[in-house]
Swiss-Prot record:
Highest taxon of the lineage: Bacteria
Highest classification ranks of the organism: Bacteria, Bacillati, Cyanobacteriota, Cyanophyceae, Oscillatoriophycideae
Protein name: Uncharacterized protein SYNPCC7002_A1392
Pfam hit, one: DUF6391
Amino acid sequence: MTAHNFFWDGDWFSPQASQDQNLIAQLDFVPGLRELLFIRQAHALEHGTVWVLTELAERYPTAWRHHYAELSGMSTGQGFYLFGGVDKTDLYRAVSTAGDRLRSGEWNLAIHPRCGTNISVTLLLTAGLAGGAAWLLPKDPLTQLFGMGTAAATAWAIAPDLGKYAQQHITTAIPLNLALEEIQENTDESGNPSHFVRLRWQDAQ
């Protein structure tokens, strides 16, 4: 599975190296701003890392790489988690490669079809359209049922594109200010493996 370049085709939305650090300098009084900008960049690097691991598994398949395409993640104000078994050497290389590729212009790696943003957009859209249909349509059960079905089908049809748009403009940003600090291996009580990729903020040169 390969990332496709759907976005950032115009200069208006092209990321600039110092855009986030300039925002912090100008709006440092806004509570949580630095953490929010950090999370957006970490989110993009998380997606890019999963893409690179998926490509690695496709090009050089091994027994321990077969589930790389199924990895899930969660970004925080200190880095991001990857849930699932990953070879630590593969992960170090993937984080580094993803960061380099994102910063060199492969911005499409910041968008991932299995992102939780897409699920949230789908649920919100379905609820909104279903609520609108219930309010606008006649109240007889058959019409209401038809309206709900149409609303759900419409939401599922347009949600993927809206989810990609939300990822591009709201929940991710190109990691121009992040550097890898360390990777920690973890195992939960059920024995499920995960890794925490700890990042640090650095001003772009």
